[in-house]
Amino acid sequence: MIQLAVLAVVGTYYVRRQLNQPSPLLPLDLLGIPIFRLSILTSICSFTAQMLAMVSLPFFLQNSLGYSEVMTGLLLTPWPIATLVTAPAAGYLVERIHPGILGSIGMALFCIGLYSLSTLTADSSVTGIILRLMLCGAGFGLFQTPNNSTIISSAPTRRSGGASGMLGMARLLGQTFGTTLVAL
């Protein structure tokens, strides 16, 4: 409890000090830009959801479905492969389709994929698992690329370094939240 109190005091001091710096280490002033703030929050949420799935799935696949460690690893592979394929495609499309539309399509696919993962049962086939994971990965790739582009482009050009730092912080914060939620 004492540690949390110290964290609150030091955190408050740090944030107030950063707000008065010309080149802050933590550029909180960028959160005053509505589209930047929304994109950062959706990035945090998407990485939280991703880690919830990616950390909990190995336990489910091994303990509930009885797959070996090797098979579990192979079953999880379609997600990053689908992301690997769709993220560059989204980079190409973001120049032709509004990032909000493309990101919304990606987020919708990601949510459908996550929901479909929640319907897995002991009778689910390997093909069914792979298709669900591919849907998650494809949606994630279609969402992240336009969202990242929006984050960087919504900040003033001279602040692109700070925006990039906030992008990395959002990713790590989301991954940390997701992993922590699995542990609870």
Predicted regions and their residues:
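Phenylalanine-glycine-rich, low-complexity intrinsically disordered regions
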Residues: 1-2, 15-20
